[in-house]
Amino acid sequence: SDYIKRPFDMEVVHRRVLNTIKLYAKQRRLVAMVTNQVFEKEKNSRMLISVLSEIVEFRNGESGMHVLNINILTTMILEQLVKKTDKYPLSWSNRMLISTASSLHDIGKIGIDEKILNKPGRLTPEERKIMEKHTVIGADMLANLQMYEDEPLMKVAYQICRWHHERYD
């Protein structure tokens, strides 16, 4: 109990104060440990997504900046969307989730023939149709990861991957 009855025994008061200080210090250490673990988990997730994105870009012959640019643009668009309208009340963590998931938008390109993927110049209509399948290929790849199907990142990444070339105009 937190109450000490009168008359006060100074030894009991002293022990209670020390125990309270120790508990507070332990709680702070635990909070710091959990915070560090969450940070490490987030860092590792972003690192793995960056590695996958780099693999796709390397195979595609892109500079390595495409995914970073998409990530930055997604973040900027989401911030403006939240500022301009109440229609999409996205929290900071939701915006970061969407931004992270956007890094996987072109993962389906790994399933496209290199001759088409790295062709200099314009694609033929047939090649264009094949290239357009990268959205379906990527979405299927993500959908096949059934053990992660309920994860928010996977759900958002699937939607972005599948529909990022659709035009709503």
Question: Where are the regions a protein language model picked out?
Answer:
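The C-terminal output helix
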Residues: 18-36
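Short, charged amphipathic alpha-helical "coupling" segments at sensory-output junctions
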Residues: 32-47
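Residues at alpha-helix boundaries and the short loops/turns that link adjacent helices
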Residues: 7, 20, 24, 110, ...
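C-terminal output helix
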Residues: 7-17
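Histidine- and acidic-residue-rich, metal-dependent catalytic cores
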Residues: 43-169
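Conserved Rossmann-like nucleotide-binding pocket used by diverse enzymes
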Residues: 4
